[in-house]
Amino acid sequence: MRALRVSQALVRSFSSTARNRLENRVAEKQKIFQADNDLPVHLKGGATDNILYRVTMTLCLGGTVYSLYCLGWASFPHKK
């Protein structure tokens, strides 16, 4: 029973300290993303969002092209 209390105290102290260190920045992010500046929402976060968007689109396009290539390669008979 004592071990249970000790473990609960440890979990409580770790979870509360981690929660107290982080400040709530939701209001700041809401102002940024709700601003009327004619940018798409996936680019309002700045350069990081732009890079992340381009990398994601490149990987998706590359995967699509590669899957079509593999389908084309598999659809023709192979010489043995």
From Swiss-Prot:
Give GO BP annotations, semicolon-separated.
Answer: mitochondrial electron transport, cytochrome c to oxygen; mitochondrial respirasome assembly
Record-level Gene Ontology MF annotations: cytochrome-c oxidase activity
Q: Which domain of life is it from?
A: Eukaryota
Q: Do the record's keywords include Glycoprotein?
A: no
User: Which pathway, per its entry?
Assistant: Energy metabolism; oxidative phosphorylation
What residue ranges are annotated as transmembrane?
47-75
> What membrane topology does the UniProt entry give?
Single-pass membrane protein
> Could you tell me the keywords of this UniProt record?
Membrane, Mitochondrion, Mitochondrion inner membrane, Oxidoreductase, Transit peptide, Transmembrane, Transmembrane helix
Its subcellular locations are: Mitochondrion inner membrane
Which segment is the transit peptide?
A: 1-21
Q: Which residues lie on this side of the membrane: Mitochondrial matrix?
A: 22-46
Q: Which residues lie on this side of the membrane: Mitochondrial intermembrane?
A: 76-80
InterPro entries the UniProt entry points to? COX7a (IPR039297), Cyt_c_oxidase_su7a_sf (IPR036539), Cytc_oxidase_su7a_met (IPR003177)
According to the record's subunit comment, the protein's assembly and interactions are: Component of the complex IV (CIV, cytochrome c oxidase), a multisubunit enzyme composed of 14 subunits. The complex is composed of a catalytic core of 3 subunits MT-CO1, MT-CO2 and MT-CO3, encoded in the mitochondrial DNA, and 11 supernumerary subunits COX4I1 (or COX4I2), COX5A, COX5B, COX6A2 (or COX6A1), COX6B1 (or COX6B2), COX6C, COX7A1 (or COX7A2), COX7B, COX7C, COX8B and NDUFA4, which are encoded in the nuclear genome.
Query: Which PANTHER family has this protein been placed in?
Result: CYTOCHROME C OXIDASE POLYPEPTIDE 7A, CYTOCHROME C OXIDASE SUBUNIT 7A1, MITOCHONDRIAL
Return the similarity comment: Belongs to the cytochrome c oxidase VIIa family.
Q: What does the record give as the function of this protein?
A: Component of the mitochondrial respiratory complex IV (CIV, also named cytochrome c oxidase complex), the last enzyme in the mitochondrial electron transport chain which drives oxidative phosphorylation. The CIV complex is the component of the respiratory chain that catalyzes the reduction of oxygen to water. Acts as an assembly factor that specifically drives the homodimerization of CIV complexes, mediating the formation of mitochondrial respiratory supercomplexes (respirasomes) containing two CIV: supercomplxes with two molecules of CIV show improved activity.
Per its record, how is this protein called by name?
Answer: Cytochrome c oxidase subunit 7A1, mitochondrial
**Source organism:** Sus scrofa (Pig)
Q: Give the encoding gene's name.
A: COX7A1
